[in-house]
């Protein structure tokens, strides 16, 4: 449009000599059309347009006859003012289509940006990995007979192959079809969404929940909404927060304070800079996925209460994995109390009910897809009413939501998958450390192996895949800082001692073949990320030996097929 305007201003005497105000005034009535008829080009175009109107007026449909076509061939039916497009384009005096200005070089820009990523070795290649449900944790590559063992999936508990989940998805898929049919506001609000949100609220022992298409969307939508709606809000963000949280904070346009990772002193120093009346929100994760560290949730809640801040806790890498029922690290911190009370809330205050908001995913430990947030009923209703990321997107398919509910119910009633996963994780960590492989120390289920160079990390990943049929993804910038590149290993209940020994032996060989730095080498360099650093105290796993000794007989029977009352918040709250 701007290009047409510029051309018109340069070639049309009428437009050139008229002010913008005059043109706007003329456009409000027929005067502009009258003036346009005096133009040799616009006049012809207007006459041609009007001459065709009789052919598009409302008439009864009739069948064309050969005689009518013969008496009125197409060429004679055209207006005498009609003209061919190529005639107008070819008239150099009419419109000059060649701009004298240089256009932006989009192609050059894109190629330059991609070239930079290739140069710094952060350009990403996606491996074709097709996980096999009946052979978990196996997968095949592009050819079905080319099978590998997957060691880096986020399907932490193997729920992607769980019969309860799959059967429920099949049942609902057959009855309700493949899609939801609309947004939650228009034809996409259904019993499956209500059931899933009720399950999630009960899991986290919060008043209500809201399901999003992914947790990236949930984090972005919620955090951006806070900043856009609450004047003078300050968001305090851990420096290792996930990209979805960073994006949400950026989109919020709120003032932000980034505090050092898990550093309570730094967080308090920043909180203390603002009056208690200033609205504040602390955004952090429970398990940080690339290093495996765990946040001091209880202490952060203490600071939030002291300085009048809301707490926003991302439990994406913890739901399903921690706590007696899989509600995450916040539940795990009061393990015995929640184990005893089951589906009910403990009589005493817990960390879980001190956290204002919890976001989580259905796409990792629960084996499906989607994200969610839980919290107070009025908070959830506010998100439902104002968050564009929720309002203007199609609802998850009914089968996905039903399968997710089945996964939550299953994991709530068993400890065995979590215990098996933690047991296998300890086995891998201990044996890798024993042979000097630099595992970044942490208390969680993540096994990050430090490489420290993007090219070497890619070579190690490729060698494991091509030579040993083991798939471990290399992690590089911007997911981790430059110089801290690593291999990220995530054992599951299916990675028992036999597969674990294969991985340990393969990594040992790869480190030798590529001359990668081991723990002793990192010690000589002064250490990095907790590997080879002096005065590093041993880190205890969050799952204790006593907890790993529990069985399903220790679970409160009230969690097995409990009657969970539907929560109607996402339908709208009646006055």
From Swiss-Prot:
Cofactors demanded by this protein: pyridoxal 5'-phosphate
Catalytic residues, chain numbering: 364
Transit peptide: 1-55
Annotated GO MF terms: 5-aminolevulinate synthase activity; pyridoxal phosphate binding
Subunit structure: Homodimer.
Family stated for the protein in its record: Belongs to the class-II pyridoxal-phosphate-dependent aminotransferase family.
Free-text function comment from the UniProt entry: Catalyzes the synthesis of 5-aminolevulinate (ALA) from succinyl-CoA and glycine, the first and rate-limiting step in heme biosynthesis.
Listed name of the protein: 5-aminolevulinate synthase, mitochondrial
